[in-house]
Amino acid sequence: MKNSSIILVLVFFFFISSSGEAKTCSDGWTCVGEDKCKVNCMAKHKGVGTCTLYIIPSFPAPITSYICDCMFDC
């Protein structure tokens, strides 16, 4: 009985501690400047925005675009 009580307490503690973690979500839009990306991300989601260059392979030339990657807690 004593061992099962300890296991029950440990399982309960693990469940409570893991349920409180924030998940990370993301949003993205066309980047019009690093500073504007950071400001818009903070205003929309209270997150951190970074301009990232994405290269999409295509023929005859690859397509490149800058996207504002906004990472925030859900």
Swiss-Prot record:
Gene Ontology biological process terms in this record: defense response to fungus; killing of cells of another organism
Q: List the disulfide bonds.
A: 25-74, 31-51, 37-68, 41-70
Task: Tell whether Protein biosynthesis is among the UniProt keywords.
Answer: no
Q: Mind listing the UniProt keywords for this protein, alphabetically? A: Antimicrobial, Disulfide bond, Fungicide, Plant defense, Secreted, Signal
Give the transmembrane ranges: none
GO cellular component terms, alphabetically, are: extracellular region
Q: Classify the main location.
A: secreted
The answer, when asked if Secreted is one of the entry's keywords, is: yes
Spell out the subcellular localization from the entry: Secreted
Give the highest taxon in the source lineage. Answer: Eukaryota
Q: Where does the signal peptide begin and end?
A: 1-22
Family affiliation: Belongs to the DEFL family.
Name the chain's protein.
Putative defensin-like protein 186
- Look up and give the organism this protein is from: Arabidopsis thaliana
Q: What is the lineage of its organism?
A: Eukaryota, Viridiplantae, Streptophyta, Embryophyta, Tracheophyta
